[in-house]
């Protein structure tokens, strides 16, 4: 069993929040860029920037126009559902790299992404953000994944992988792999031209906790082309409704796509976002939670683990 340490709550200045809230409550994706962390929340039009080692309030950066309703039910219906945040490699279009916030695709209004170019110091150039219509990309998946629910993404080796979350009884988790160069070129063109087709769609059975099936929630790249993921056992029968969570796991995937070892996370937090760095044989893991309750702040958790076969399951 894997023990994560509480690092901080994701608190914000109420005066800076569009609804006067003192925290982020639905963290859903996490990327670390140097000494900064960026977090996307699925019920906001902002992303948060924070120092993982500090206590200053999370800075909110607007990525989509307009404000969401204060009512929970109305907000859920209207939100863009930005479930995923992934780091993009430098290209001619964004020389210092970029972040890509991705809508889940589970409803027509949830099929947008936002490319956020980075400055040389790791800050986001908000004025240069690009909103991309992902409907053409998602339409190419409908024949195999009728109820799409994208919850994670990772650039690993030559692949850009989207993680589809299989909800409920009979739901199938899937890794949707694209040629990374093709997908980045399409994004650099603001989604113009024909959307790239996936080169593979691979289903994954992740098991269950307390009889509730595990489903992907996020991923982060590892050295050598492999990656690690988080998955949650949530009792939800579809891609829209939330359900009670029975716990989370952290797992590993080899560069060739083979599933490795999975570790149940102690104390059953609902982990929705994941970021990791590896140095000198140590894996430094950061994770964010979502309690599915707007009155509760999301939390930043961490762990330092020995990176090797005992952890990953690979020799």
Regions from the PLM with identified roles:
Residues 1-315:
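Sequence/structural signature of beta-propeller domains
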């Amino acid at each position: 069993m894997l023990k994560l340490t509480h690092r901080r709550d994701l608190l914000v200045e109420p005066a800076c929040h569009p609804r006067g809230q003192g925290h982020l409550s639905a963290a859903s994706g996490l990327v670390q860029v140097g000494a900064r962390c960026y977090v996307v929340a699925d019920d906001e039009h902002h992303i948060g920037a924070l120092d993982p080692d500090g206590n200053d309030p999370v800075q909110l950066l607007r990525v989509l126009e307009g404000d969401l309703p204060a009512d929970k039910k109305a907000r859920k219906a209207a939100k863009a559902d930005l479930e995923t945040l992934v780091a993009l490699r430098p290209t001619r279009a964004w020389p210092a790299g970029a972040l890509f916030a991705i809508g889940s695709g589970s409803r027509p209004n949830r099929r947008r992404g936002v490319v956020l170019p980075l400055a040389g110091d790791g800050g986001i150039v908000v004025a240069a953000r690009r909103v991309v219509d992902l409907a053409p990309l998602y339409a190419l998946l409908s024949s195999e994944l009728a109820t799409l629910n994208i919850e994670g993404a990772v650039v690993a080796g030559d692949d850009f992988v989207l993680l589809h979350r299989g909800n409920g009884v009979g739901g199938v988790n899937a890794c949707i792999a694209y040629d990374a160069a093709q997908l980045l070129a399409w994004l650099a063109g603001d989604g113009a031209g024909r959307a790239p087709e996936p080169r593979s769609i691979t289903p994954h059975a992740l098991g269950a906790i307390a009889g509730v099936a595990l489903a992907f929630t996020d991923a982060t790249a590892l050295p050598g082309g492999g990656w690690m993921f988080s998955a949650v056992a949530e009792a939800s029968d579809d891609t829209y409704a939330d359900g009670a969570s029975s716990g989370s796991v952290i797992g590993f995937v080899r560069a060739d796509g083979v599933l490795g070892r999975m570790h149940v996370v102690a104390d059953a937090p609902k982990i929705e976002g994941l970021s990791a760095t590896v140095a000198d044989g140590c894996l430094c893991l950061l994770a964010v939670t979502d309690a599915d309750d707007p009155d509760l702040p999301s939390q930043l958790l961490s762990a330092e683990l020995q990176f090797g076969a005992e952890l990953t399951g690979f020799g």
